[in-house]
Amino acid sequence: MIRAKKGNEEMFHADPSKSESQDAAFKIYDLTAAISEKTVVFPGDPEYQIQKVCSLEEGHTFNLCHMHFGNHTGTHVDFPAHVLKDAKTSSDYSIDHLMGSGLIIQVPDSEKSVTRQFVSEQPILKNDIVFFKTANSMLSKQDKFTEKYVYIELDAAEELLKKGVKIVGIDYISVDRYDAEDLLVHKSLLSNEVLIVEGLELNNAPIGRCEIYIMPLNIPKMDGLPARVVAKL
């Protein structure tokens, strides 16, 4: 691509020196779950609701709706303030912190949790964004919450910290087990400024190394935010 400027506007044009195959040398994978009335939320969290405010069918000059849902709905990022007092929020992380070298790891469907032993065997590098694709991905087709989902064990989280990762993600609503009232996995990761991405849609995700881009809504001082997440090969 060739970049040109017209006033303050940047324009991108195809570079005639590059072939079509070169321009299409990479593929983008959307790892974001759609948000709708069927979106599963953690028990007690606000459910998604949409209400028409203006409608062309009702004689208005435009369509407009009001959306209501929690900030941890669907695919979302947890910031340290989610579980820690006086901790960092969305305002404290630049967008470039939320992108970089990634590793999507397939966890065998027979595994009920992500264990320290399993993590220790993975080719994880310092500053990696690590996503775990588990049997949870099959739950994305269900519209009811289940307590029996694959979670990350505390010693596995500690192993991830030892390896120096910067972001950890999983394909269900929480990295902690359902009955973990103390949320020790959240606290272990977030107290070390390892951000968490939950609710990933990994059914068609590429397994292995890729570039990952996490783009939360630009709302300041939040403990968590819905995000669009993509992988590039």
Feature locations, PLM:
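Active-/binding-site microenvironments in catalytic and ligand-binding cores
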Residues: 2-233
